[in-house]
Curated annotation (Swiss-Prot):
Alphabetic keyword roster: Cell membrane, Disulfide bond, G-protein coupled receptor, Glycoprotein, Membrane, Phosphoprotein, Receptor, Transducer, Transmembrane, Transmembrane helix
Cited InterPro entries: GPCR_Rhodpsn (IPR000276), GPCR_Rhodpsn_7TM (IPR017452), Oxytocn_rcpt (IPR002062), Vasoprsn_rcpt (IPR001817)
One GO term describing the cellular component: plasma membrane
Pfam family, one: 7tm_1
SUPFAM superfamilies tied to this protein: Family A G protein-coupled receptor-like (SSF81321)
Phosphoserine, modified sites: S365, S367
UniProt name for this protein: Oxytocin receptor
Length: 388
């Protein structure tokens, strides 16, 4: 894949061999060329992805910070998933955007290794935090009495981040600043054995995509079965309650109690399960083309590695970091409603306090009153009760 910007993308390698292109016999006479039209399309797409990912996830974090329900377990996982998406945007999308603009990596060897390391950290973190949130929803539905406690949540998230940092370590050893043509240097992967690219890309695909998807499918299979059981119980209990007679009055009352219990489960948790399921679906849709072309390129020597569709497919993975904030907004719209209300409320108070013609004494008095009463009055006027 020498000469294509996609060669710089995350775990994408010089897939033709296990050595840098400059060491495959004779060096090329000059630096390879690229498709400039395709490069401009890549730059435009990456600019859009970067803007949407940064703005969307920043709004999510701000909304979670200002909500009165910030200690919710679901919101805790949403916060860390948004942080992981920001890591993807800053350390994966942004370097790739700069790389597409400059065509070659311009920087020291240490920066090359660091960028490659952080690119994969974002991939691992986004995947495994989503997996952790899905496991939490599975426990909440299937075994509510054994669901994770707050201390366990924090330890699980901390362990996930540490595991992602460790799992990404091979990038530091594999990538380095190499001479890819006469006088031309780039951040490139080097393998000792010719089967190295196959082994490494296959491992990344298993660790970041195949194994998590299998676990996610098992989680939502269990969740679906439990919900089906509850709905069936609810229907049967409602029928038994409707048939209540004098002889079965106690059974009818018990059935009504069971109906009420099922309703509580549905209202409190089904919506969060739906949200997590849509996030998982977006993850699969966005990452499948990326890993498909990665595996194709290492296992098929005749793969069209420089084709436009091949390269664009690798850009789709980052769309996942753009989709998640919109999914949050769809299912927890009250978060953004509160954020907008607080913004307009604070803006109105600022404008009111900045009216011309007021004396300095009155300004000082108004400012002091605002500071003292901000916590109580602004919360009463600017925030709405959550519907979660």
């Amino acid at each position: 894949m020498e000469g294509t910007p996609a060669a710089n993308w995350s775990v994408e390698l010089d897939l033709g061999s296990g050595v840098p292109p400059g060491e495959e016999g004779n060096r090329t006479a000059g630096p390879p060329q690229r498709n400039e039209a395709l490069a401009r399309v890549e730059v435009a797409v990456l600019c859009l992805i970067l803007f949407l990912a940064l703005s969307g996830n920043a709004c999510v974090l701000l909304a979670l910070r200002t909500t009165r329900h910030k200690h919710s377990r679901l919101f805790f996982f949403m916060k860390h998933l948004s942080i992981a998406d920001l890591v993807v945007a800053v350390f994966q999308v942004l370097p790739q955007l700069l790389w597409d603009i400059t065509f070659r990596f311009y920087g020291p060897d240490l920066l090359c290794r660091l960028v490659k390391y952080l690119q994969v950290v974002g991939m691992f973190a986004s995947t495994y935090l989503l997996l952790l949130m899905s496991l939490d929803r599975c426990l909440a539905i299937c075994q509510p009495l054994r669901s994770l406690r707050r201390r366990t949540d924090r330890l699980a998230v901390l362990g996930t981040w540490l595991g992602c940092l460790v799992a990404s370590a091979p990038q530091v050893h594999i990538f380095s600043l190499r001479e890819v043509a006469d006088g031309v240097f780039d951040c490139w992967a080097v393998f000792i054995q010719p089967w190295g690219p196959k082994a490494y890309v296959t491992w990344i695909t298993l660790a970041v995509y195949i194994v998590p998807v299998i676990v996610l499918a098992a989680c939502y299979g269990l969740i679906s079965f439990k919900i089906w059981q509850n709905l069936r119980l609810k229907t049967a209990a409602a029928a038994a309650a409707a048939e209540g007679n004098d002889a079965a009055g106690g059974a009818g009352r018990a059935a009504l109690a069971r109906v009420s219990s099922v309703k509580l489960i549905s209202k409190a948790k089904i919506r969060t399960v739906k949200m997590t399921f849509i996030i998982v679906l977006a993850f699969i849709v966005c990452w499948t083309p990326f890993f498909f072309v990665q595996m194709w390129s290492v296992w098929d020597v005749n793969a069209p590695k420089e084709a436009s569709a091949f390269i664009i497919a690798m850009l789709l993975a980052s769309l996942n970091s753009c989709c998640n904030p919109w999914i949050y907004m769809l299912f927890t719209g009250h978060l953004f409603h509160e954020l907008v209300q607080r913004f307009f409320c604070c803006s109105a108070r600022y404008l009111k306090g900045s009216r011309p013609g007021e004396t300095s004494v009155s300004k000082k008095s108004n400012s002091s009153t605002f500071v003292l009463s901000r916590r109580s009055s602004s919360q009463r006027s600017c925030s709405q009760p959550s519907s979660a």
